[in-house]
Amino acid sequence: MTITMPCGEPVDLQQVKGQEHVKRGLEVAAAGGHHVLLVGAPAAGKTLLARALRGLLPPLSETEVEAVAAIHALARLKEDEAARSQRPCVAPSPDASRAMLYGGGAGRLRPGAVSRAHRGLLLLDDLPAFGPKLGSLPAILDDRAMRVERAGVTQVLPAAFQLVATARPCPCGWYGDVEHACACTPARVRRYQHRIPAALRERIDIHLEVPRVNYERLTSGRLGEPSAIVAERVAAARRRQATRFAETPHVTTNAELGLDAIRAHCALDGAGHSLMKAAVRQLDLSAGAYHRILRLARTIADLAGVDQIGPAHLAESLQYRARPTL
């Protein structure tokens, strides 16, 4: 059984028919380094779209290449010189043990999937199937590091990865579908949805619903944008961030902004304050959710090539928030 594997070659967005709103969400995720969850029915294309994210990301910087190479050396992974600048993508199976996910093991320290994905993508397909093992993930996302206890000594491995995950809305996959009847009871749907910890849902900035593509769209000869074109916009947004954060230690993307940096770089105008005041009241947003919306809006403004976050950027950011679970 394969427990942990690379993600394979990136999928070109042009291969995916329709799903324009999902593609836009992936563009925003790539531009700002935001975590993303794709939810949809069976065969809706969730995994294909998740794999497309890697093709939108810029290459590793020289500093990042060295950091990734050090982890690969510790894990005794063979280096591919031709792909040294390509961001890693690791896709562990739900059957993977905690040690395979998070690191550890008897004898020498072995980096887990979260560290092997450092400065790249951690792809968790069928997220609810990982079950209780997901409990450690929120703290790792916050710290961007993995702490491994061995013989009373804490060892720290880097784990600054971008999470991209997929899930069905319920065990059978048809909850909320207009064409297929869901076979699950409300209680079963609730138990399934709650297998993704609330703390983890809260840390995922972009939640995307992936509908099944209808026959007309599926058989249309119309092609969407290739990943290379989208990646150019992502690269331009990343360059804006690199300039902005040149003097800010340990920050390379908007997703990594701390509170002080949010205050400095995510200021709102009067219309923006009015919109967010209404959103906080109507959606009962926590302080953490509020700050994540600002980070995301900063990325959307960067994609638009503007310095000031406006109401349109905030409105799009709010659309990516998680829907309430049952």
Where are these regions (language model features)?
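Conserved ASCE/P-loop NTPase catalytic core
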Residues: 11-194
